[in-house]
């Protein structure tokens, strides 16, 4: 590969991901090999291959136990986290506790048990997005750098784990940025020179798995986040879950059968519910029809929009709390908000729009940006800014983001002493002097927490370290200087220094237990390479088989009496010659590249197909296409060559 490709922007979503790049003075959102501009955040493992994206999601009903999704709801969380425990009950794939209470996902791949961390699954989705961009930008320019987005309300460990996922995917993560802030860029970029002056903009971002609200002021290309609030576990999937439960109960009532015992039935139902939910955003009623859903029972039923709203009403209302909190934190009245901007697929739900509009006293909501693509768009702009690519159109944009949670340390009696309050603009650095609690105390334990509660036990411990070697002195005399430093990714470094001795100790909070070590990341990078090689190998085998099948089927066809008698001698000779040549080449080049196999197949088809077609039109009538359709069937399927061989249509 020659020169480096431009840096890309990736929206790594709970349910779908999206990638964009700044090109030709604007952002281009890149479609994947299936022609879709968003890609399911799904990874599937089978006896023969690994599938990512559409191919993985399309076969999920056939393979629910080994198709992994929702990695974003696991990343940076502990196994014992109540949220993780609740999710495990809903997932068809197996999650168990690993070392340091880190969740591990267990699947079977090529008939062997494999164990993955959430970072690894996310890295596979990132690799897919990277490859999507790569295919569009051309093989001569290698994609290396990316800006990756996270929910604004993600905490320190979730951010760090996302950054690690990027490293495992072989990407240099230039910056982790917040999703609503990225969406705000997408919204504000075209208004930069509109002369409107300062605008207060509320971004309401409700996606597949997470929810964020951010309030920004945008003026002349300066995007300043005033406050942010949200829920890292609220989104479209939770609405789907309500529908699944509703219909599972209905099924139980009607047929006295519990379909929840079958992962496959449950998955088919969930897919139908997701579809029904989308339909209900534009229709007042919809039906669900699933043949032979469970124990031979055909399930046909319907649901109205009103019933769906009733099932999810508490969740919809829950979306309004962060809006209030955000305004309160920004010390802003709702009447002073100029624009309320919708982002994320779930903002298409009419009831959510209505509640939000009512909250803002009937104000028109702004739907000017694409809710599925705005985040990747903003990330691509930020990537261009950070690499100096974007030209004057974007280079003078300035993003001022904030840290979502208060950060501090534990002082005597388990009290949370805050050094950096929530919604502080980042990057930032804060110092404070502490002292010992008892006479002649030789060391102090610095425990770092994030959260809003007064006592540390109610907050989240990010990490701890000791500062030792303090000379004997009465309590309160030693001076220990503690420095909290948050970088532009929202990731925290803490250091402490004993002023008398100059003893220092520091931690990047992320060295906390459960964080991947350098060695682990290195190992995962190598494994990612290995899986990629596996995928490549499979494509090779498929391409080789296609050529081989075609050649042998075609030779058998032209040797059949029916066909042979119709062929002119010259046609037969040229075909025999070409087929023998192809078989000889195959024999000698078992390890050729995919492109070579495909090239030979094309050449062969170019010669043989017209002759055979002429023959059939002339009425040789030899039962269908040769060899059961070698002509069509032998070509690699669907561009990617790795699509599922069969899929269920609900």
From Swiss-Prot:
GO terms for molecular function: ATP binding; ATP-dependent protein folding chaperone. Induction: By light as well as by elevated temperature. PANTHER family: HEAT SHOCK PROTEIN 70KDA. Coiled coil: none annotated. Keywords: ATP-binding, Nucleotide-binding, Stress response. GO terms for cellular component: axonemal central pair projection. Residues 623-642 have a biased composition (Gly residues). Residues 623-650 are annotated as: Disordered. The keyword Repeat does not apply. It holds the Pfam family HSP70. InterPro entries: ATPase_NBD, Heat_shock_70_CS, HSP70_C_sf, HSP70_peptide-bd_sf, Hsp_70_fam. This is Heat shock 70 kDa protein. Belongs to the heat shock protein 70 family.
